């Protein structure tokens, strides 16, 4: 049965940027990695803001640079008070519920290829399922999680989160849909991930433009044309 129209809030948790994306250290300096994380966040926020069915966007972090980006995009910034990603997400979900959210979609800040079409697809699936979940490329991580209502399932971000989310949903006997999408699946952690991102030819993305500007494309053996 299709539910009443959803009031959807998006939650984008952002980890501390000190020593972020350390597996890219062979290619990017500390500052370049930090800037790359911020540019990926910009891409994700731009997509979320372009998805009309999302009523409000909440960024959760304790990094001042993330605060500045949240302000620039006109989204809510919640300072992370709890230690641990799941605690921070839980706190953000509570904030959303208090303000009328009937659904929340949790998105990582490092999936710069995600599009409004992807998010609208997730929201459409959420009209008939309490949990919609998309995996990472490895099949182990969770790269998109829609919960209706927001407390339908606790979160288990960390190792093997995809399977843990599903196991808990089955235990609770809530309706769920599990899917994959190449764009959503690509979270950039390694040099191979970075090459995959560049090959997607997302030249209009902030993340891609940074790679071009800083000469990283040349380091990868790629010249922008």
Which residue stretches match the model-derived regions?
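N-terminal nucleotide-binding beta1-loop-alpha1 segment
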Residues: 1-24
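A short, N-terminal amphipathic alpha-helix
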Residues: 37-53
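Acidic donor-binding segment of Leloir-type glycosyltransferases
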Residues: 52-77
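Short phosphate-binding loop-to-helix
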Residues: 71-103
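Short aromatic-hydrophobic micro-motifs that form the base-stacking/packing surface
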Residues: 105-107
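Conserved donor-nucleotide/metal-binding helix-loop-beta segment in metal-dependent transferases, i.e.
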Residues: 114-139
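Short, glycine-/small-residue-rich phosphate/pyrophosphate-handling segment
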Residues: 147-169
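Conserved alpha/beta core of the MobA/IspD/sugar-nucleotide pyrophosphorylase nucleotidyltransferase superfamily
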Residues: 168-225
